[in-house]
């Protein structure tokens, strides 16, 4: 009984809106027409009594106006939008959960057809009965939850007559002793028992495959259990009661509050016949929107019922049985022969119809993929991220950035040559980094502890074996280790720390300086 209207709203246009509003089956007009008609008659009746001098006098009308003003001022104390908003949200969530757990047998049927191999009658019966028992369990659950399925299968004999269950299976089901409790689990147990028999007979190649089929069957049972739980425990009765009562009480008070016409709390100086029509029309529109909103919740609160938009439970049972048996039996082992496809050794270029070939496509491209990052320099410098420079202890050489973690990436430009490192501008990021470091009070101490450039050339030209401890003590700043003595540090480690302290903020050397150092090394050698 589901109403399909997706074709009418395939495009956003005024005609789609009109086609949607003119539908009758499952529409708000069908749900609302009777109550709207009753409200209009009641409103006109009360309005006639209020404006008739024969029924009420002028003094009584004044009292009416006072009550109407009080009602109109205090009607907003009923939080209709708040109550309906939460109520409809809960109803829609339950509706979605029920729909997601109706139960579909395709996954189980495909697994059964692929894992239970064989074309003999015994194997075919096992495959068919596994699916039929699953649908039988669904019939038993739907029969107790859906009134439309209950009308289709009023007795257990009707299930046998419909072919979902055989006579000896009905006797076996009746012999199961579980008191007054439901026997939904019995067909599921039959299905899993057939899997064990098929594995024992060698029709299932491995235990892993049998377990895979069993997982699908158990998952199907979980869906039916959740469906039964939703039917067993509905929304607490007080919630729909208070919502439905609040909506109808609101419009009952509106019958009195919307009769008198007051402009800024006073009667209009020049009465007109059009004045009473304004509250009448606005009350009707409010009734359509608010009560229609409530009707949406009423129609969705039990989607397994008999409303126009409730689920097609009978169709689902028939479909699961026919599709499942077709997969495991009629379409078993009917795979087409493997041949070369139409795009073999060719570019894959699917075709379109003439009407759709010229429609532009929007391919999946990242939103930042076409952003052109402008780089003014010939090379990009890469360095590790420094979360907070202020936390660095510049008196410790362990916190200095090692030069090997920096990288220079050349920018390939179509025109022009690569500039030398000496003429290249420093990156703004490093300028900001130097500026922050320069603000620290440690900078003066760092420069005082640095050795001269000539000493640096000397250490770089000497072999590690020629550097003795006395030379290091003369040139390098004296620092105490954890034991307070410099002699506990080896020569190579001290030379590495000295080089790091000499150039704490120099990122890289230019090409001319590198050549000069190379010449000095060769001359000293």
UniProtKB/Swiss-Prot annotation:
It is found in: Cell membrane. It comes from the Eukaryota. Its main location: membrane. One of its GO terms (molecular function) is chloride channel activity. The keyword Acetylation does not apply. InterPro entries: Bestrophin, Bestrophin-like. Pfam families: Bestrophin. It is a multi-pass membrane protein. Forms oligomers. Belongs to the anion channel-forming bestrophin (TC 1.A.46) family. Calcium-sensitive chloride channel subfamily. Forms chloride channels. This is Bestrophin homolog 15. It comes from Caenorhabditis elegans.
């Amino acid at each position: 009984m589901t109403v399909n209207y997706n074709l009418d709203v395939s495009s956003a246009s005024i005609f789609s809106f009109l086609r949607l509003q003119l539908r009758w089956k499952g529409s708000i007009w069908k749900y609302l027409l009777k109550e709207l008609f009753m409200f209009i008659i009641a409103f006109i009746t009360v309005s006639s009594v209020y404006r008739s001098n024969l029924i009420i006098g002028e003094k009584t009308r004044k009292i009416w106006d006072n009550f109407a003003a009080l009602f109109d001022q205090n009607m907003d104390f009923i939080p209709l939008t708040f109550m309906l908003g939460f109520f409809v949200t809960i109803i829609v969530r339950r509706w979605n959960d029920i729909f997601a757990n109706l139960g579909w047998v395709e996954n189980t049927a495909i697994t059964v057809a692929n894992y239970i191999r064989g074309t003999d009658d015994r194997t075919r019966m096992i495959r068919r009965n596994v699916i039929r028992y699953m649908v039988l369990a669904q019939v038993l659950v739907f029969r107790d939850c859906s009134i439309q399925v209950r009308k289709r299968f009023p007795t257990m004999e009707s299930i046998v007559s419909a072919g979902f269950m055989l006579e000896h299976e009905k006797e076996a089901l009746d012999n199961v002793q579980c008191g007054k409790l439901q026997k939904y689990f019995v067909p599921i147990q039959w299905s899993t028992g057939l899997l064990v028999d098929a594995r024992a007979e060698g029709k299932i190649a491995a235990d892993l495959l049998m377990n895979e089929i069993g997982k699908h069957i158990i998952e199907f049972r979980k869906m039916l259990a959740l469906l039964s739980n939703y039917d067993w425990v509905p929304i607490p009765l007080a919630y729909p009661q208070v919502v439905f009562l609040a909506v109808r009480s609101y419009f009952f008070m509106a019958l009195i509050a919307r009769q008198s016409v007051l402009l800024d709390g006073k009667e209009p100086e020049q009465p007109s016949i059009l004045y009473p029509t304004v509250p009448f029309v606005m009350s009707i529109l409010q009734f359509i929107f608010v009560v229609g909103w409530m009707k949406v919740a009423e129609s969705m609160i039990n989607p397994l019922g008999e409303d126009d938009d409730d689920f097609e439970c009978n169709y689902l049972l028939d479909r699961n049985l026919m599709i499942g048996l077709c997969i495991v039996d009629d379409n078993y082992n009917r795979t087409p022969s493997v041949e070369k496809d139409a795009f073999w050794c060719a570019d894959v270029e699917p075709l379109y119809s003439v009407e759709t070939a010229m429609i532009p496509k929007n391919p999946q491209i990242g939103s930042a993929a076409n952003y052109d990052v402008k780089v003014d320099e010939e090379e990009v410098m890469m360095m590790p991220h420094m979360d907070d420079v202020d936390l660095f202890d510049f008196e410790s050489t362990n916190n200095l950035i090692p030069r090997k973690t920096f990288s220079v990436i050349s920018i390939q430009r179509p025109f022009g040559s690569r500039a030398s490192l000496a003429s290249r501008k420093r990156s703004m990021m490093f300028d900001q980094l130097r500026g922050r470091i320069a603000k620290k009070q440690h900078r003066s101490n760092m420069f005082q502890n640095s050795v001269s450039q000539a000493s640096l050339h000397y250490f770089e030209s000497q072999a590690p074996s020629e550097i003795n401890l006395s030379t290091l003590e003369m040139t390098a700043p004296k620092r105490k280790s954890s034991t307070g003595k410099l002699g506990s540090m080896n020569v190579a480690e001290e030379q590495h720390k000295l080089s790091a302290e000499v150039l704490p903020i120099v990122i890289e050397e230019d090409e001319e300086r590198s050549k000069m150092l190379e010449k000095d090394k060769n001359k000293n050698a």
